Structures are given as structure tokens and as C-alpha cells.
Amino acid sequence: LNSQYPAEVYYCLNLLEEVDHPDLSDLIGQVLSNDIVVVRIEALQRVRRLKLTDLADHVVARMEIEADTKVLGQAYKTYGALGQADTAERLEPNLSADDYDVQKGAMVGLLRHAPHNKPAQDHLMELVRSGEVEERRLAADLLGEIGLSVFSEYLAELLEDPDLLIVDQAITSAGIIQDPDLIDSIVAKIPVAALQPAIKYAMHSYGESAIETLDRAFCAPHLIRQEKLHIIDILRAIGGTKAIETLCRYIDIESAEIRHYVFLNLAHLHYQADPDDRYIYVNHLIEEVDVITWLLAAMGDLYGQADYALVHSALGSELDLRRDKMLLLISFIFPSIIMLDTRAHIDSKVAELRTFALEVLDNLLSNELKEIVLPLLDDLRVTERLHLLKVRFPQQRLSSLNRFEEMINSHYGRAFYWTRACMLHQLGKDQNHHHSSLLASSLQDGEPVVRETALWSMSELNEEEINDYLDIHINDPSATVRAVARDLKEKHAAPPNSS
């Protein structure tokens, strides 16, 4: 206990507490005078947590001689927890202390254990409504450490503060208090990227009580992809049956990227479909293999065509994600842990791990599923894959031009957003006037990169309505789309070069 190494002192204190040593109180009292600041703070925290009222005089003695403000602040918190008759008398004079830690210690010591203390209440209200940013930030921090829902109305005020750092701290404190009346206000701030880590922490603390509000927010039409992905992250962090049931409702969402992320997080929660529902995922799997087979054929037709290099690359990225989605679907039907391990090793550069993953699938899958899954995972050329799948998923060979036309007509609506953007870029690059309606409808796409590419392509095609569209998108919610619209507007307004 007299060691100069804090870890050794903590270890001894833990052992003494674990065995319920008869002299535990006296021994902690000795540690209160340790030379090391962090050790004194640890001792005071233990007195507070264990409510060792027989050490109240030791705490008072420490308060009277302590020079370190962090230790002094902790001493005030501890003394408040011990519930002594003179608590208000000793702590109230420090409510307006110049030092942050001392003031915080006195406030927490009083309000956490005597929430109706009038001077402390009045001072808290002054801090919450102060014109000074630092004082409001102190209030947001204090409310979390006080940890009582009786003060939630103050947190509600701070959640609407113009300073994001204060809102961030208020969200963190709300997660500690867990007043359900604050959930709506917190979830409404998901679109603010800077607040998302604090929101995730708070919602994880709320647990299942936050899921209904998160579900409503997810279904709101104004939320963009990144915000929906963040809600999925939160649901995964909360975990449990209710979170899984909520994620399962999103498996048919229109966005291919979000759908893949839903599957990924369900897999990490080790979701297993009920026997009566497995056919749903088998059907999804067959649909996915159908698209993958089409992608293989399309990439084969565009391979080596320099004009379509960007589109070919986008199809390759989409192929990788859809192949991964196929493995995630299998994990819902067969043992999840085994399938996630297999998924991790299927593309391993270590031959033994890859071979083992394929053997697991060969032993696990039914014959029907083997026929459509293994050709997409084994070491085969594209032509060999297509040959093995041609009975179930026949594909025809097309010229690059005809394949791209088919892609626009049949794949655009189900494609990942980067693939859509590359296809629109190709239309502008090729001066292709046959898909003006697609370009116009793509200006309403939820993805900024798709909207800005549609604007660029329409500009390249000199569509008659381009100026009207540019005027609209100068006020687009996305800064990148606004910038593209402004640049294109200036380009169209510039006089033609006489040379």
C-alpha cells in the first residue's frame, strides 16, 4: 500500500476489498495520505463507492490540507456521498470556486446526494443559462456526473445549444442519466456527423429503450445513406433480440449498399433464421447469384475496352460486395460462427486457409446450393464459372456497346451508387442522348456523387433544361453538388471562345 507504483497499490486494494478484509476501512484511510495524486483520488473514490462513513473525518482532514485541485474536487464528491450533517456547510462555499475541478466536486457532492439543495440548484441553473460557453460546458458535464433524471430539463436545454461541443457533452451526459424523454432529441441529431460518436455511446447506454426511436429515424425519408448506416451501427452496438428483429425489417431496403451493411451487421450479431424463414434467404441467395453471374458476363464483354475501363472497374467493386453478401446470406442459414470464419478465409493468400474454407462450404452446403455457390468461389476463370452456371443462369455474349445499353436498361436500378455514377459518366463521355430521362431522374438520387455526375453529363450533352437544373442544384444539400453546379453554371455563362 506504500508502493510508489500506483498499479501495485490498486492491486492491493482490490485484493483487500475482494476478501472483505476486516481492516479495509483503516487501510484505505492510510492510502488517503499517499504521496501520489492518482492514488489519493483512487482511495477517495473507493470511500465514496463503499460509503465508508467511518472515514468522514479522514476525508475532512484531506479537504483541509489538500493542495491538488483534482484530489480536492474528488474529496468534495466523496464527502457528499457520505451524507454527513454538515455537508452543505462544508461544500456550499465552493460552488463558485474559480477552479473547474473544485467547483465540479462541490456541485456533484451536493446535488447527487441532496438534489434539493437550493444554492446548488440555483448555481446549476446559472451555469446552464450562462452566456459563457465554458460555463455551459461545465453544466453539461456536471449533469452527467450528478446522474439524476430530476435535472433532465436542463439537459434538454443544453441539447439545443448552438455550440456543438456543449451538445456533444450533453448527449454523453444523457446517456448516463438515461431519461427516455431525451431520446427523440438525441436521435434527431444523427445527421450532425460530429455528434455521431457521442450519440452511439448514449444510445448504447439506453439500450433497447432507444430502438423504437432509432427505427422511426431510420425510416425517415430525409436521412441519407451515411446516417442510416450510423443507425445500423448503433443497433448492432445495442444488440439483443429486439435489435436483430429491427435489422431484419431492413433486409429488403432499396439501397444496395445499405442492404449489404444490414446483412453484415446481422451476421456479426450471429443472426440465425428460423427454420420456417430460411427459404427467404435461400431465395435472396439465388437472386444474388443471378446478379453476380450477370456481372461476370458484363465484365467479360467490357474487358480490355479502354473506353469502358471506369465502368468495368465499378462492376468489379460491386461484384466483390455482392459476393460477400452471398456469404453473409449463407451465414443466416448455416452456423453463423463457422460461416464468418469461412468468410474471413475464403480470399486468404494462404493457400491452406483458402482450401479449408472451401472444404467447409463443400461439407456444409446442400447439393443445390453447392452448384451455384462454389463456382463463384473456387479458383476458376470467368468462362469456366459461366459455363458451370449456364443451366441455372444463362448469359449471352454481347458487344461492349450492346452490353452497356443493357446495363443502363436492366442494371442501373439495382446497381451500387458508384456503379450508377460511372454509368452516368459514360453517358456524358459518349455524348449519348438516348437516356436523357435517366439523367434527369438521377438528379433526385440520394447519393451526391450520382447527382453531380448527372449534372456533368447533362452539361456535356448540352441538354436544353441544363440551366434550370443547375439553378436548382446550386442550393443542393450537398456541398460537392453545389460546387459542381456553380462551376457548370459559370462555364455555360462564359462567352464562347472565338478562336
What residues fall within each predicted segment?
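Amphipathic alpha-helical scaffolding segments comprising HEAT/armadillo-like alpha-solenoid repeats
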Residues: 1, 21-33, 52-64, 84-96, ...
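Non-transmembrane accessory domains of multi-pass membrane transporters/channels
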Residues: 1-26, 311-318, 322
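N-terminal transition regions in large eukaryotic proteins
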Residues: 3, 312-317, 324-343
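Short inter-helical turns and helix N-cap capping residues of alpha-solenoid HEAT/ARM repeat scaffolds
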Residues: 4-5, 35-37, 67-68, 98-100, ...
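Structural detector for internal amphipathic alpha-helices that build alpha-solenoid repeat scaffolds
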Residues: 8-20, 30, 40-52, 61, ...
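Redox- and metal-dependent alpha/beta enzyme cores, enriched for Fe-S-associated oxidoreductases
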Residues: 24, 360, 368-377, 382-394
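Non-catalytic terminal/accessory segments
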Residues: 274-275, 382-383, 481
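Amphipathic alpha-helical segments within extended alpha-helical solenoids and repeat-rich scaffolds
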Residues: 285-294, 383
